[in-house]
């Protein structure tokens, strides 16, 4: 798409894709379409700048109007000051009013999701851990410490979800070992939870997990994950995939685990949902292990990166940026080799042609 010579219109929740491909963003919000030159990251920065400037100008203008209005009120009844009052009134009337900017979509999860207790410093250790079903898909060795956030990337079918299922005890390891440290309490999100079905309401479904809560306590917990008002009486089967993810996360985080294991938590979320979850996980004081295809999300949240590649795994202890540097370096080296081969091949062809000419 970057090399396509004609226009491209793309609708996407993939922010990395938008960063890499587009050179202008149109945002449709509050019934208005606004144009922002540049990619997605540039759009976010410009939107914030525009919001801040408009709010600053709006506040300044309102203060000036109030100041002028006080003068008008003070002097409009005094004959010697009537002209001054009229002048200030006209100044107010001539102003082009700067409206307050539309609010950001500032919906955020506001639960107390921080761990109830700390783990020891050593959280997860794996040594030559072979994961898979009939045969090994990958082998994983790592040593994860308290508070670290491990993002996991890789192609389909290489064992990312299988690794998570193995360490939470859903399936057995084929060989090798893994162990968790002391005081570990795991909260596990399976991507299939986004497909969860139930004929119950959101409130009743949540109550099944926490029957000892009062209605007020249950509704407060759900409200923290954006289920407010009549939303709690929606049938679970009528929820979107993103709403089901929020319900699942609410159930999980209500236990306040100190280790979160999440398998593709953003798959069904829109950009606002992803950015809200990003903010929550960045603030999370426990240890995080998560699989995601969303590179933008991984880059924002992960402090370390584990990449699954054709039966092997590589750990990047400095996160996504270190991995990207490696990809850029390999791409540059490959390009140089290609250029070298092209030049070398051209030289041989020219020599061959010269020799052939002389022979003739």
Predicted regions and their residues:
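Short low-complexity stretches enriched in small and charged residues
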Residues: 80-83, 105-106, 161
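Intracellular alpha-helical coupling/juxtamembrane segments of multi-pass membrane proteins
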Residues: 47-71, 75-101
């Amino acid at each position: 798409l970057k090399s396509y010579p004609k226009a491209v219109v793309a609708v996407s929740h993939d922010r990395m894709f938008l960063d890499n491909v587009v050179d202008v963003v149109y945002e449709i919000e509050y019934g208005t379409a606004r144009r922002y030159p540049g990619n997605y990251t540039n759009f976010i920065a410009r939107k914030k700048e525009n919001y801040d400037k408009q709010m600053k100008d709006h506040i300044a203008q309102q203060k000036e109007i109030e100041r002028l209005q006080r003068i008008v009120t003070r002097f409009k009844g005094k004959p010697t000051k009537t002209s001054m009052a009229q002048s200030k009134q006209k100044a107010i009337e001539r102003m082009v009013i700067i409206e307050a900017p539309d609010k950001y979509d500032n919906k955020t999860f506001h639960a107390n999701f921080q761990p109830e207790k700390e783990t020891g410093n050593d959280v997860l250790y794996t040594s030559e851990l072979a994961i898979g079903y009939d045969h090994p898909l990958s082998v994983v060795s790592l040593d994860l410490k308290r508070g670290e956030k491990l993002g996991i990337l890789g192609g389909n079918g290489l064992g990312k979800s299988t690794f998570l299922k193995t360490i939470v005890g859903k399936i057995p390891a084929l060989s090798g070992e893994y162990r968790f440290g002391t005081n570990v309490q795991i909260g596990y999100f399976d991507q299939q939870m986004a497909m969860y079905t139930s004929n119950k309401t959101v409130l009743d479904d949540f109550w099944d997990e926490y029957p000892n809560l009062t209605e007020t306590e249950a509704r407060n917990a759900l409200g923290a994950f954006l289920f407010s008002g009549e939303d709690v009486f929606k049938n679970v089967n009528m929820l979107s995939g993103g709403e089901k993810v929020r319900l699942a996360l609410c159930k999980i985080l209500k236990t306040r685990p100190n280790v979160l294991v999440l398998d593709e938590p953003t798959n069904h979320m829109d950009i606002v949902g992803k950015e809200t979850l990003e903010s929550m996980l960045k603030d999370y004081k426990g240890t995080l292990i998560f699989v995601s295809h969303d590179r933008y999300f991984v880059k924002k949240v992960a402090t370390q990166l584990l990449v699954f590649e054709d039966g092997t795994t590589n750990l990047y202890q400095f996160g996504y940026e270190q991995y990207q540097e490696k990809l850029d370096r390999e791409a540059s080296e490959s390009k140089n080799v290609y250029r070298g081969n092209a030049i070398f091949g051209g030289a041989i062809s020219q020599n061959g042609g010269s020799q052939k000419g002389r022979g003739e």
